[in-house]
């Protein structure tokens, strides 16, 4: 694991989260979303997206499916299509950049 930010999230997932009641209103969970966002968009943008996701995960929101978008955005991803694991998204991201 090269990224210390991902290491911090993994620590939370492994040692802190199991002691807390399940309360994330989205799928994937906010912690997994942050890991995927860091993998997809890098440390700064990925962490920013992860924090934005945590801030919109509260009891007054409906929740639902919210995968990491291929393009950087801080709001809920309107495209609920799963773009596959990180390696697939990375290839898809390259294709999107070529098209646009």
Swiss-Prot record:
Q: Per the UniProt record, which residue ranges are transmembrane?
A: none
InterPro entries tied to this protein:
Membr_insert_effic_factor_YidD
Q: Which GO terms describe its cellular component?
A: plasma membrane
The main location is: membrane
Q: How does it sit in the membrane?
A: Peripheral membrane protein
Protein's job: Could be involved in insertion of integral membrane proteins into the membrane.
UniProt similarity note: Belongs to the UPF0161 family.
What's the protein here called?
A: Putative membrane protein insertion efficiency factor
Tell me which species this is from: Enterococcus faecalis (strain ATCC 700802 / V583)
């Amino acid at each position: 694991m090269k990224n210390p930010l991902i290491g911090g999230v993994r620590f939370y997932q492994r040692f802190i989260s199991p002691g807390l009641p399940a309360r994330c209103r989205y799928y994937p969970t906010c912690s997994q979303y942050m890991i995927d966002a860091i993998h997809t968009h890098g440390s700064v943008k990925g962490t920013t997206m992860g924090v934005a996701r945590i801030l919109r995960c509260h009891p007054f929101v409906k929740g639902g499916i919210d995968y990491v978008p291929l393009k950087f955005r801080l709001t809920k991803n309107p495209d609920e299509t799963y773009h596959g694991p990180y390696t697939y998204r990375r290839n898809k991201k390259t294709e999107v950049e070529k098209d646009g």
